[in-house]
């Protein structure tokens, strides 16, 4: 049985296919992506609190949203990086998902609005991820209990950022105890059985993903750089344990 939210999303995308194609302006794709999120949004989820905050990173300010579930007793804070093929998505497109995950896990969430391509190409999003993890670890009492542990979570392109952030900070004693990677793309050069089988007609299109990678990398040619392709890392010693979540009919499935 297909979940009602998934059925609604598939129906909406079929009726509004512009979101899938780079021939549309980035502004139009972002608007359509938000419309998809609103179309599939479930019933409102009651929270103890939902608060918009600003993270003062070096040379820039990032927007973030802090979620505290009802009956909060969590000893962990989940730092969440949304999906959107490096180019689209924001706090609003993934707001309901964060509420649902926070409520289900009984954990506090901090969702990050990192900078997007093409306005801010590689390595802007990666730098935002790494600097965010450092800032949150150094200011943990602002977001969670002082002895809370950190979990880094990302879906799709946010999964790439989560994986890279966890790897790049693995020796910095940030108390990151786990990384959860949902449908993460692991590099622009990867070709798999699932990308061949599901790369067209299953919402996420191979051609669109390649186009978004081009915008994101903006001419950067070293695809063996582990910040681009996390699987190319030579040494992951001390990296937090990872949970990989994949979907059957997803071109990115085998990258997990």
Regions flagged by a language model, labelled:
Residues 1-69:
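A glycine/proline-hinged amphipathic helix-loop "lid/cap" segment
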Residues 74-84:
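Short beta-strand element of the alpha/beta-hydrolase
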Residues 82-88, 249:
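Active-site glycine-rich loops that stabilize anionic/oxyanionic intermediates
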Residues 92-112:
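Short amphipathic alpha-helix adjacent to the substrate-entry channel of hydrolases
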Residues 120-142:
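Alpha/beta-hydrolase active-site loop
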Residues 143-156:
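Alpha/beta-hydrolase fold nucleophile elbow
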Residues 147-148, 163-255:
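Alpha/beta hydrolase fold serine-hydrolase catalytic domain that processes acyl esters and thioesters
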Residues 154-164:
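Glycine-rich nucleophile elbow surrounding the catalytic serine of serine-hydrolase chemistry
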């Amino acid at each position: 049985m297909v979940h009602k939210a998934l059925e609604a999303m598939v129906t909406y995308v079929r009726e509004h296919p512009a979101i899938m194609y780079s021939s549309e302006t980035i502004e139009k794709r972002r608007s359509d992506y938000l419309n998809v999120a609103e179309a599939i949004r479930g019933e409102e989820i009651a929270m103890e609190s939902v608060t918009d905050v600003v993270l003062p990173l070096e040379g820039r300010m990032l927007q973030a949203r802090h979620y505290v579930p009802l009956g909060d007793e969590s000893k962990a804070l989940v730092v969440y990086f949304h999906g959107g093929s490096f180019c689209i998505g924001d706090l609003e497109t993934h707001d309901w998902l964060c509420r649902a995950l926070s409520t289900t896990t009984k954990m506090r969430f901090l969702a990050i609005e990192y900078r997007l391509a093409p306005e801010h190409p590689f390595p802007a999003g990666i730098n935002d991820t790494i600097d965010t993890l450092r800032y949150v670890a150094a200011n943990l009492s602002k977001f969670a209990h002082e002895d809370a542990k950190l979990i880094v979570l990302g879906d799709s392109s946010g999964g790439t950022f989560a994986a890279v952030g966890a790897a790049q900070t693995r020796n910095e004693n940030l108390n990151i105890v786990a990384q959860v990677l949902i449908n993460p793309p692991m590099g622009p050069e990867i070709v798999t059985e699932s990308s061949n089988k599901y790369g067209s007609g299953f919402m996420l299109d191979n051609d669109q993903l390649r186009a978004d990678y081009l915008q994101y990398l903006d001419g950067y040619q070293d695809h063996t750089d582990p910040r681009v392709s996390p699987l190319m890392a030579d040494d992951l010693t001390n990296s937090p344990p990872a949970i990989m979540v994949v979907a059957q009919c997803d071109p990115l499935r085998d990258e997990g």
